[in-house]
Amino acid sequence: MGEIMYQRILVAVDGSETSLLALDHAVGLAKAFGSELTLLSVIDQLKLPFSAEYGLGARESHEDLMRNVIEDLNEVTMNLRETHPGLSFDARVEEGRPAKIIVEVAEVFDLIVIGSQGFGLIAGWFLGSVSNEVVNSCTKPLLIVKKPGDQKPDPSP
């Protein structure tokens, strides 16, 4: 029974408020269980800027996006090192559809922590579309973190 419940925790980080809340929860769990923590940022290929809109070629746009994601993740990891010395964690960046990449990477983890934007019924049944797709595709235990105050509307009149 002395086995760590969650030896490896994966947290998806995209810089949004809910992903940073998810990171806070993941850090708390990693500290409580003595777990290894991995931060994952996914470059969504569908969000690559169109060259005509920005006056950049596709290659420059991709490189700029990649650089921005890496800089944001580096800032998060530097903050973690300062605020949680001794915390065992690593960070990685992948490219693709965020939900698909999260589910693929999740296979070697014991718990997945992800923030949900909570866009409402149409966008994702009260979860954001990425978290909704992860919930429906992932076979690993999940912790979905929502912003305080995000809740289903009361269906009563």
Predicted regions and their residues:
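Structural beta-alpha unit
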Residues: 1-5, 78-112, 149-157
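Gly/Ser-rich helix-loop-strand patches that form or flank binding pockets
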Residues: 109-153
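General small-molecule cofactor/ligand-binding pocket signal
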Residues: 38-40, 90-94, 143
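Acidic, proline/glycine-rich short linear motifs
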Residues: 42-71, 151-157
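Small/aliphatic-rich secondary-structure junction motif
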Residues: 2-56, 137
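Short, solvent-exposed amphipathic alpha-helices that sit
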Residues: 25, 64-76, 101
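Short, well-ordered secondary-structure micro-motifs
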Residues: 22, 49-52, 101-104, 125, ...
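Conserved N-terminal glycine/acidic-rich loop preference
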Residues: 39, 66-73, 109-111, 115-118
